[in-house]
Amino acid sequence: MQFSVLAGSLEKMESTAKRLELTGILEELLRETPHEVIAQIVYLIQGKLRPEFEGIELGVAEKLAVRAVSKSSGMPAARIEAAYRRDGDLGRAASSILEQKTQTTFLAEEITVERVYDTLMRIARLEGARSQDMKMRHISSLLNDASPRDACYILKLILGTLRLGIAENTVMDALAAAFTGSKSNRPELERAYNVSSDLGRVAEAVSSGGLEAVRGFAVAVFSPIRPMLADRVRSESEALEKMGAGLAAEYKLDGERVQVHLSGGRVELFSRSLENITAYYPDIVERIPGRLRAREAVLEAEAVAVNEETGEFLPFQELMHRRRKYDIDKAVMRYPITVNFFDILYLDGRDCLGISYSERRALLEGVVDEDSFARCVPVSTIPDESALEDSLENSINAGCEGLMLKLPDAPYRAGSRGGYWLKLKREYRNELGDSLDLVIIGAFFGKGRRTGRYGTLLLATYDDSRDTFPSICKVGTGFTDEDLDQLYQLLSPRVTLKRNPRIDSGMEADVWFDPEVVMEVVASEITLSPVHKTALDSVRKGAGLALRFPKFTGKLRTEKTAEDASTDQEVIALYKSQKKVVPDGQPGV
């Protein structure tokens, strides 16, 4: 497939902020994509080379890309850097420079999607002393044969600066429309994606075999399953109103959610966001096979840091010391853990997703041979509100965050929320001491001591029905100087020249970001807002909801994706459950 076809579609997609138009352009591209290339196309438009859990990254710095453009164009690197500073986009700058190129390559090799993709994969695999020079030569070889427009999008793919605003849901809409005749079939594709976590594989299947091929997807060891998520409740009475008596209450631990895959003594571990984190937990890899009565299994657990002397649980942040490339053995010794299992998704050839929580829990307890390192999360059956209050108090006294509440008869719904699981934490019982996990979508430049940094951040919830990020507040308090420096470093690579199509905001930020970074925020209350877009029209026509006096807690939710952020439905529920409903005119912006 000619790369120019992909580049043309990318150019069209970059020029629109309308989701329906984006989906239509993508659908047209997928229809004309040969089956053998469609997985590559799906990965590339998402800015990836392979699914997230394989951890393949290009590792190309801007300076290296500038050297490659210089080599291909014959122009000094300083001139290219000046054009880059002017345009703010190396792809655009390179396109302009290559249009002025006087030399002609008579024996140019054809630029196809396959060639570009294979070259990028070779670049990603390069390591060692000469790897940077080899990467530069590979990039230059593509640019030598590329048209200016092709070169622009090759560089955007290499540097990860392709800003299309296309999420998995948009890709699945386009795939369903292109190969099954209707977007209404997206749930079938979504189920396949939820058990495989590989949208490229789903695209290959539906493009060649339609819905029948997609229905053949099944749970497989070492292919992570997208985790089931919980809604929140603020009180014991609300939980019982939603679930009824007889619900199961598990302790909610403050650790890292880990999906454990076991086969024949081999263990791999995946995070909540599907990152392969096996290297950070060699103690789990070594010890868990001896604690599980299974040949093959996929289980979910919470890895929690502990004080070995007292046995007490330590905060989640302690686990971050394990996130290092070197001296991991020292970190394991210094920051010991326990592995606390709470669900089983697959066991010795049996897919457990469709069976009830009660059945899964019984299987789990039969599989885990408990000791001080590996155990099952404590659970109890709740007959009434008094018992739920006692269970919450017991969990907090045990050093936990609160409770996870689960319907006994409910299946495991991979990749979704839906009321089958609820979380009840101690702070949710306050007037609005509740914390919310919000996505950073924009920023306003600081003044005074904050000059040269982002002084205030624009935050959003996640609207899962529209797959958008509607704004909910600006936050400028709770930050230390160290926080501001860290956020500037974290957010600067995510700056976009125009607002991401998935962002819904009535404000104009000084800087827009791709919605990727999640932070924890507290506030005094939730108010109606004429400015912010969260839950727009849900409470009052023309009004959204906003946080009043929001404050950063100091906690970045690095384990969460943007789609894991607090939803507009959660905010509506919190607003309605306030003891007094705050009137209009208190926007809390």
From Swiss-Prot:
One GO MF term attached to the UniProt entry: metal ion binding
Documented EC number(s): 6.5.1.1
Enzyme kind, highest EC tier: ligase
Requisite cofactors: Mg(2+)
Active site: 252 (n6-amp-lysine intermediate)
Catalytic activity: ATP + (deoxyribonucleotide)n-3'-hydroxyl + 5'-phospho-(deoxyribonucleotide)m = (deoxyribonucleotide)n+m + AMP + diphosphate
Gene3D superfamilies: DNA ligase, ATP-dependent, N-terminal domain, DNA ligase/mRNA capping enzyme, Nucleic acid-binding proteins
Stretches that traverse the bilayer: none
Annotated keywords: ATP-binding, Cell cycle, Cell division, DNA damage, DNA recombination, DNA repair, DNA replication, Ligase, Magnesium, Metal-binding, Nucleotide-binding
Superkingdom of the source species: Archaea
Binding site for ATP: 250, 257, 272, 302, 342, 417, 423
Gene Ontology biological process terms from the UniProt entry: cell division; DNA biosynthetic process; DNA recombination; DNA repair; lagging strand elongation
Entry function: DNA ligase that seals nicks in double-stranded DNA during DNA replication, DNA recombination and DNA repair.
Sequence similarity: Belongs to the ATP-dependent DNA ligase family.
Protein name in the entry: DNA ligase
Species this protein is from: Cenarchaeum symbiosum (strain A)
